[in-house]
Regions:
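N-terminal accessory beta-strand-rich subdomains and adjacent acidic, glycine-rich linkers
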Residues: 1-167
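N-terminal small/glycine-rich loop or linker at the start of catalytic domains
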Residues: 170-178
Length: 178
């Protein structure tokens, strides 16, 4: 799903102050996660129960790496989970264009994640002009992790490649500071 803002005579430019999309889960699933952080994704993934995220957060942080999570219960997407019955659930986003990325903040009492958008310097979550769309919010459920990987949903929700000729693109190895 995503939110669409059609052109309106009296609404042209507007500010997103917050997005409160919620994902209510049915239990204390096993999750593979990294901390929600505005500045880096350079963390080792943690495998834990959802209820253990806050207690494991401090051990994941390396103060020498400029890591600053926004919350002790905040994680980045894509968030992969497995239920006790063996179903795999993934929460992510697609078509992220001119919009802040979505993190997820967990309420451990209810196992409900609320979207948390990366703010700009003024604390605003987004500046938009109609007509426009938010990114797609995706929830995938599959019987196995390999079925999750085989899904083309995220690819298909993104815009098609704007380049007509991609033959010149070749895979390479890179070592260095990016």
């Amino acid at each position: 799903f995503r939110y669409e803002f059609p052109y309106q005579k009296n609404l042209s430019y507007f500010v997103i102050k917050e997005e409160l999309t919620q994902f209510a889960l049915a239990g204390d699933h096993t999750a593979w996660w990294i901390p929600g952080d505005y500045d880096t994704q350079e963390y080792n993934y943690v495998e834990s129960r959802l209820s253990e995220i806050s207690s494991k957060m401090e051990a994941v942080i390396n103060p020498n790496d400029s890591q600053t999570p926004f919350s002790t219960n905040g994680v980045q997407t894509s968030l992969q989970m497995r239920t006790d019955k063996g179903l795999y659930i993934n929460i992510h986003e697609a078509a992220l264009i001119e919009y802040p990325c979505m993190h997820l903040n967990l309420d451990p009492a209810t196992f409900t994640f609320t979207s948390h958008l990366t703010p700009d310097a003024q604390g605003w979550k987004g500046r938009m002009q109609t007509p426009c769309n938010t990114p797609w919010r995706t929830i995938q459920v599959a019987p196995s992790a390999t079925a999750q990987l085989a899904s083309r949903m995220i690819l298909n929700l993104n815009e098609p490649c704007a380049l007509e000729d991609t033959d010149w693109i070749k895979p390479v190895k890179y070592i260095g500071v990016w």
